[in-house]
Amino acid sequence: MDNNFLKYLSTAPVLLTIWLSFTAALVIEANRFYPDMLYFPI
């Protein structure tokens, strides 16, 4: 049971979903604290 669950967690779609959720949360929180950081007017 535990081995199958760990094997499921290590599949590519699950890892991709977890990684994209983490990245999105990081960008959203950075944008909340520093709102003008996401674009650089050059």
From Swiss-Prot:
InterPro entries per UniProt: PSI_PsaJ, PSI_PsaJ_sf
SUPFAM superfamilies: Subunit IX of photosystem I reaction centre, PsaJ
Subcellular location: Plastid, Chloroplast thylakoid membrane
Major location category of this protein: plastid
Cellular component annotations (GO), alphabetically ordered: chloroplast thylakoid membrane; photosystem I
Record membrane topology: Single-pass membrane protein
Pfam families membership: PSI_PsaJ
Leader sequence residues: none
Keyword set, alphabetical order: Chloroplast, Membrane, Photosynthesis, Photosystem I, Plastid, Thylakoid, Transmembrane, Transmembrane helix
Membrane-spanning ranges: 8-28
Domain of life: Eukaryota
GO BP terms: photosynthesis
UniProt family annotation: Belongs to the PsaJ family.
PANTHER family associated with the record: PHOTOSYSTEM I REACTION CENTER SUBUNIT IX, PTHR36082
Stated role: May help in the organization of the PsaE and PsaF subunits.
Protein name per Swiss-Prot or TrEMBL: Photosystem I reaction center subunit IX
Protein source organism: Guillardia theta (Cryptophyte)
